[in-house]
């Protein structure tokens, strides 16, 4: 039995799981407040009376954003006052992404949520002295955002263990692209097609077809595949390794983009003026298999599928 889910990342404006602030972080909206109360991190009266303004068939994400973090602040304050025995180990195991994510979120809060590209130039360019000063200034906020991730992942791994014990495997979803307003782009600009001002030169989407005369303009920054190839695809290996710790099976979204990807000049209002560029092909997945071994992957091969895309799916060995 399988349970297929959407991406778990923290959602940004528009509330799409395919536009996340981080490819490694979990969404705080999924943290179960009743479980926090059972753990002694909340009192029921601290959240039971809150009107989340939702109905059984509709979530009010605006209300969640406005009201949930105040509750999580109380839980995290108690957690940080007496950290669990495994907390230091959690921080150590996630040190490759968590400190940058927590700093990014603290800085977003300090800048009223605006995109990182609108921050002061030293912060945009991650000048070491400026980052050190920010880490000191926002230390309490950084601690909060790290603690939130501990709560999310503790509950998630308990949920996955329960599902697996019932004979249920979880199919997770990995978006091919990350959001422009994400810690992934801010912390690793060299991995994306950005200009000297850290602005995308080309963005992602799909060409016009029978369903859409203008195509689809997703707007995500595109990868510098030459850089990823030169670095042995380490970022991708880390990203996929993280996914396989969360899920039993990983569905890779827009798999055809690894064969060829659609590139649209930044600033366009539609996808009409885009063109196809060559992706990394099977080389990426061979490097991933060398590093991680064989894993259960599903290749989402919808959309404009060519013989070349079919060959890549066949070479990879992944079911489509």
Predicted regions and their residues:
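Catalytic domains of carbohydrate-active enzymes, especially glycoside hydrolases
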Residues: 1-11, 242-247
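Residues at or immediately flanking beta-strands
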Residues: 2, 167-171, 296
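Glycine-rich, histidine-containing beta strand-loop boundary motifs that form or position
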Residues: 4-9, 172-174, 253-254, 301
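Alpha-amylase-like alpha-glycosidases and glucanotransferases acting on alpha-linked glucans and related
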Residues: 14-153, 178-320
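Conserved, well-ordered alpha-helix/loop/beta-strand core segments that scaffold catalytic motifs
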Residues: 145-178
